């Protein structure tokens, strides 16, 4: 279904324990249908979320809010490195289109392709190897088989370790540059979209990398409600 104005949000990392972020995101969800006629959740919405069997109760208000938005405007989720594991039934069961890796949309006459951007943004070789391991179907299957009393502490410990760098400006700059280089190569191909959405680096960006070809990164929602709007024009925004 073609859209006129797509609201893009990513990297809220809900469940990480930051004060007020869940309430801010719920306020964003209430506002979202008035900001555009479609909503794209570009990964790492949750710090960790691995299917309904391992659903933290703290996420219940957000999941209810997402279902309400999806009943009003087309809503799409593409998984991030923190929340693509396991079943996507939590999303599809609430009327949300969900893809683990990549999604294509038509917005204001433009072809938009969205991915989380973690594959393009990993800086260290050790992190790229770790990312490949924890994103594998085997890791998802092992996690799904674990009792919640073991599974939750395990991923919380891994999350704290793997996410310790995400507020480091040096890491962000390097991740953003890797993404930019990957985006430039992708946008230069014959079947390139007009707009490529990548998140993960937490560096908010709207940049025309070549004539008529744009890179959009909405930034990290947990930093004051950052998001982006893709339509006839492309812009960054913040929840006021």
What feature does the model see in each segment?
Residues 2-7, 14-107:
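Core catalytic region of metal-dependent phosphoesterases/phosphodiesterases
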Residues 5-13, 111-118, 213-219:
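Active-site-proximal beta-strand elements of phosphoester/diester hydrolases
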Residues 5-6, 37-38, 110-112, 195, ...:
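Structural motif
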Residues 15-17, 47-50, 76-89, 119-123, ...:
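Active-site environment of divalent metal-dependent phosphoester hydrolases
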Residues 102, 106-113, 121-128:
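Contiguous hydrophobic, core-forming segments of folded domains
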Residues 105-108, 208-240:
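Binuclear metal-dependent phosphoesterase catalytic core
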Residues 117-181:
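Active-site-proximal loop/helix segment associated with metal-binding centers of metalloenzymes
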Residues 174-192, 196, 201:
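A short, acidic, amphipathic alpha-helical segment used as a generic capping/interface helix at domain edges
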